[in-house]
Amino acid sequence: MRQLFGLPPFSLRPPHAAALLLSVLAATLSGCQLFEPRAAQSVVPDTGVVRLQGIAQSAHIAKNAAGMPLIESGNLHDLLFTLGYSQASDRLTQMVQLRLLAQGRLAELYGAEMLDLDRLMRAINLSADGQNLYKNTPKNLQSYLAIYARGVNAYLYQMRNTLPPELAQTNFKPEYWQAEDSALLLSLFSFSQSGNLAEEILALALAQHLDTEQLPWLLPVYPDEALAVADAQKIPAQVLRNSALSNSTLQLLDTLNQFSALNTLQAPLATSWVSSPQQNLTGASSLTLHSLQAQPQHKPAPYSWVNLHSPQLQAAGLSIAGVPVLIAGFNGQLAYSISAVMADSQDVFIEQLRQQQGRLEYLANDQWQPAQQRMETFFIRGQRPVREAIYSTAHGPLLTSLAPNSSSGYGLALQRTQLDADRSLNVLWQLLSSASVEKASELVQELRALPANVLLADAKHIAWQVTGSYPNRRNSRGLFPAPGWDATVAWEGYADPMLYPYDQDPAQGWLSAANQRLTQPGYGLQLSSSWANPERAENLAIQLTKKPNPASLALPNDTSRQRPWLITQLQQMLSSGGMPTALQQALQKLPSAQRSQAQQALQGFLALPADQPLSAQQAAQLQSFLAQAQAQLFSTELQSLPTSVQQAFSLHSQHSYPAWLDHLLGRDDSPFWQHACGSKAQFLLNSFLHSSQASSQAATPQPSYSQSLLVDFSQAVPVSAASFSGQSDNPYSPYQQLPKAVTGKLYPLPNTHTDIEKVYGKQRLTLLPSK
């Protein structure tokens, strides 16, 4: 880039300034008026001509009302260059933050508040993953990544004195983008889909502050699965009593909460499906993807919309800003979506440590082994650099080590899948031109670095394939940290990809992925024990089973009034076993003034229609009942826990199958009922009484969507897209917060010249070579 612009590279270290607290990330720009005039210039106009060094001939960018860009060029070089320029103009702050996060360098931008997170990311060492991924990428794709990077850098150079406000207010000068940075972001994306690290650390913290007997009740696997009592009992008692490890566990949990808040590539939960021509009322195949809102509504969604058009490449869909491939989209012949499979290919091991003659050692196979060491330098905004050692055991990097001045104790090591010859980046690139389900199915089997549900559809066929790499575990489910010195819980290589779940053109006519459990207990491959709440998947299956499916099924509708699976499960719980008798006994214990009201509320709940939409009043009462259960069931125990544990437990309940719902659906013998209200029946009646006061105005849409992609092969313009949050992360952009009339509206993303002009009109931003 020095040769391209004739300038020295940006400094690796920001100027010294006061440390910027974490709250800056979520703050508004009030108080930053000094930056406003220049920062506002960081927004690229929608029309006009921009001359840039690096573009060969010309390219055009057009945007619809939601800011979804159409990028047109007569050649692939300028298309990729302009894609880099466009994504940087929309998402530079996100791209820079994610690169620094993956590198373990956020303290350079935000100060000492990020130092613990930087330590964690340096230990995990995603930079090595990115380098390996890039090394295994074909030379032609490496050149494409370099072209894309030059487009990013053209924006960086153009706006070098008028960067977006969050970067401008810290005087941070981002380094130029490198081709390897795209591989680094894909490595961060892969890591974010690959395990339950935060859940395992949460489990250890809960066991340390409560006890191992309560732990399985708080971290259930699935409604029909037994609690992981045996796994919890494998955590050694002496480990739980170690105060130094307890303190370091809390610190690590706090850091992981920080990671979750900052990592926009932590894939959102999503509901997706493909339907065959025989299944749909239109008589054509279709693909639908609805990602759920993971970020606050005012923040942009994790993915960025793109519509690419050149003689060599036509594709439209969702992309990670910084990586010139699609995570979901349509290339003119093939539609595909990649969503979270809730994989668990990471495990935490408790290592027994000691300091011996100036070196750190860990216990393995009844012998003390030296820990591997490497040195890392951390640059901190406003402070002097620090240089620290990072240690690893045979399992992997130590995320916590011995306390200062301690000669022995425990640490936590992270083991995760390591792939030396992975070509996942090339697989994603090849999907952009794959012409059929048959060819794409063969291709995605090589997607080893990215664990995912991949759904495929062409005009005649549909398919589903699970991807990734999964360890074979001895005597463990990977739910809770295991003692590293115990060889009986070690990994034994990786699962055979032949065991990965897949299907093609099933007789039922549809395939779906909604983060649900994909394999039954006892299956020869352990994908995970950390599935999401099955409600979305079960409700979708109920709808898809009704043939033929109308096109309206794919629309991003409010589902808060249609909850057939949950209502059925709760009504069965209330009507089976000893629950009816227990409820009658609990009713008799209520004061007479409440007894009639509780009886009426119970009967109203039993009368809720599972197969029909709820009224506004019914939906509000159901939501109130669920919210009351969630808030009160574990309140006594949670209130006594450190804030970091409470926050982590709340995050876990949002992302995975939650304990409060598991208790409502069953677990009548749980000790938590006694703590909460004396009995489950009494707790349910109290919750019914509370919900009976709910107003119909209190009902809120469930779930909250983030982005929706619809591909209907029966339509002249197959692709439609909707955004529920902004396309840009620049607060001065008109596309950072979408107007109400635009939010959730479906916009076509055409791929032919005739349709393009109809949809986008003739206004363009034209990119030309500099004079």
Region spans (language model):
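N-terminal secretory signal peptides that target proteins for export/translocation
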Residues: M1-R13
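C-terminal motif of bacterial Sec signal peptides marking the signal peptidase cleavage site
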Residues: T28-G31
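Substrate-recognition/specificity elements adjacent to catalytic centers across diverse enzyme folds
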Residues: L34-S286, S291-H298, V306, S310, ...
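Second-shell loop/turn segments in exported
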Residues: L79-T82, D129-S143, A413-Q415, L425-L431, ...
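Stable alpha-helical elements in mature extracytoplasmic
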Residues: A102, L126, L141-Y144, Y148-G151, ...
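Glycine- and hydrophobic-rich flexible loops that cap the catalytic core of alpha/beta enzyme folds
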Residues: S310-A321, V325, G329-L334, I338-T488
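Hydrophobic alpha-helical segments
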Residues: Q346, Y410, A449-Q543
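Terminal end segments
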Residues: Q526, S530-P580, L633, E637-K771
